[in-house]
From Swiss-Prot:
Its membrane topology: Multi-pass membrane protein
Keywords carried by this UniProt record: Disulfide bond, Glycoprotein, Host endosome, Host Golgi apparatus, Host membrane, Host nucleus, Membrane, Transmembrane, Transmembrane helix, Viral envelope protein, Virion
Gene Ontology CC: host cell endosome membrane; host cell Golgi apparatus; host cell nuclear inner membrane; membrane; viral envelope; virion membrane
Species assigned in the record: Murid herpesvirus 1 (strain K181)
Homology family: Belongs to the herpesviridae glycoprotein M family.
Role according to the record: Envelope glycoprotein important for virion assembly and egress. Plays a role in the correct incorporation of gH-gL into virion membrane. Directs the glycoprotein N (gN) to the host trans-Golgi network.
Residues exposed to the Virion surface side: 49-82, 154-157, 232-240, 292-304
The protein's name: Envelope glycoprotein M
Entry's localization field: Virion membrane; Host Golgi apparatus, Host trans-Golgi network; Host endosome membrane; Host nucleus inner membrane
Main location: virion
Subunit structure comment from the entry: Interacts (via N-terminus) with gN (via N-terminus). The gM-gN heterodimer forms the gCII complex.
Domain of life: Viruses
Length: 353
């Protein structure tokens, strides 16, 4: 029998908790699958046609060369060491997200007191990351696995397509994890109604959001490189022009995401620096092949490429400074003036008169 003032699990809570448990189990299976897949891809004779990190031979790269039909034309991409580090780091972030979901599930599933409000568990699940968000995370991991498989088969068009799908799924996961499909006011109201024992877990949620934004920022540069790889091997274009096109694509996508963070997402969560750090790391990752390989460094286009990379880096740093300044200003704001045209204020004034 329930204690006085304490609610038991309702039918809605039980159904949502079961669905959420199944979603987290699917996340766990997908994570194990992608880890086993990425490890097996490093060993020959298991079924992978090529060693996926070596999709580009920088020694044969020529910026003045046009696309060679029916041959893989080298384009600007991550070198083997960078690609392996990128895969490992991405999977570590996936592990952190999965750990966050498991911690939330343990705290909600095994707690003795379910709260004093109706459907308290449903409220908590929706705020911490509901079943739809979990399934979006599953799609994110699955599309990343398809991206690695495309690299192994050395299919440039498929690499570009799978990277676009992964980028869109990761974007959807980040946005839904921040907004909960709700307005800022409803999200703030849901935060005030969660179970008291989950207050400390909110800090982990902030860290998870920033970590996923970090890989989203780096994935922006990988997306631009993947599009360049697919476009440069599908049309009769010069390699140097494809490199410049990748820079423009990165600048456009990054500016759009920076604007969304500043105008929309920052209202839901104050601490959001992950995407800014990720884009800076992505630009630095693009610098490494240009500096390391003589075929790129000695080209007549090297100066223009270096200028373009520098502009991209300054762009990311500028938006990072803007985010930092806005965060500090919002943090130091002690109060907010009430709007003079508020209906409640007008009603109070009329009553006073």
């Amino acid at each position: 029998m329930a204690k006085a003032g304490v609610m038991t699990l309702s039918h809605v809570d039980r159904m949502n908790l079961r669905t959420w448990t199944m979603a987290i189990a699917c996340c766990l299976l997908s994570f194990v699958n992608i880890v086993v897949f990425s490890v097996a891809a490093h060993f020959p004779g298991i079924g992978f046609p090529c060693y996926y990190p070596r999709i580009i031979d920088f020694d044969n790269m020529n910026l003045t060369m046009y696309n060679a039909i029916h041959h893989l034309t080298p384009q600007l991409f991550l070198d083997p060491v960078q690609l392996i580090v990128y895969v490992i780091f991405t999977e570590l972030i996936f592990f952190c997200v999965l750990s966050y979901y498991i911690v939330c599930w343990v705290q909600i599933y095994f707690r003795s007191e379910h709260g004093t409000q109706v459907n308290q568990s449903t409220r908590d699940i929706n705020f911490m990351g509901d079943s739809a968000t979990c399934f979006t995370f599953v799609l994110t991991m699955d599309t990343f696995q398809i991206f690695l498989l495309s690299l192994s088969f050395r299919l440039p068009s498929m690499v570009a397509f799978s990277k676009c799908m992964y980028f869109m799924c990761l974007t959807a996961f980040v946005v839904t994890l921040v907004t909960h499909y709700e307005s800022r006011e409803r999200s703030a109201f849901a935060l005030s109604k969660i179970h008291p024992k989950l207050q400390g877990t909110i800090r982990y949620r902030t860290a998870v959001v920033n970590l996923t934004q970090l890989i989203l920022g780096f994935a922006t540069m990988v997306l631009a490189m993947s599009l360049a790889l697919g476009f440069g091997n599908s049309f009769f274009v010069k390699t140097a022009h494809v490199v410049f096109g990748a820079m423009v694509a990165f600048a456009i996508v990054a500016c759009v995401y920076f604007s969304i963070i500043e105008s929309v997402l920052s209202r839901y969560m104050k601490v959001q620096f992950g995407y800014h750090i990720g884009t800076i790391l992505g630009v630095c990752g693009a610098m490494y092949p240009i500096i390391r390989y003589e075929a790129l460094n000695a080209s007549s286009y090297a100066r223009d490429i270096n200028i373009g990379i520098t502009v991209l880096l300054l762009l990311c740093v500028a938006f990072s400074v803007i985010r930092t300044v806005r965060f500090l200003l919002r943090r130091n704001k002690r109060y907010r003036a009430l709007a003079l045209d508020n209906e409640e204020i007008r009603a109070l004034r009329s009553d006073a008169e």
